[in-house]
């Protein structure tokens, strides 16, 4: 009996020593540690395209206005006037134009053409929702010998904010200019006006590029 008790004591002491050495573990622990990976999530800051940032929306006497000059060496003011008038008369009838779009004024002696445009800016279109605004603007083509100056001005939107008030008129000067569409540091676009600013700039570029391409082919 004494020997039996001594044996038990010896076994207990041995197990204590083994546990103290910290060499025992669950059989699945090592596998778990091997398979354990540390995932580090790095959040990338969205970098805005410089074409939409500070200075992209120009103003003239506090009004949003874009102007491009198209040099046409060898063309008289009358020739350019005729070309621009023909182009704008077709432009106001293009598929994206609404019925209100039209060539509204001309000054034959000063070679100036004014067109009023009304079209949709579609921000998002899905099976379940449609987010869009009416873009209204004026194009002025001023023709001189060897040059056409094309100006986009009088820009405003009509937008339904789903507040029960229907379409609300929003001026470009209170939405897409630097003051309203950019944060104080001029490093980010402000949520809400960002989509208006991006799409209006894109549309302006498209209008000017198409006009420039048309004249270049003449």
Task: Show the residue positions of the predicted features.
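Bacterial Sec-dependent N-terminal signal peptides
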Residues: 1-25
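Ser/Thr-rich, low-complexity intrinsically disordered terminal regions
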Residues: 21-218
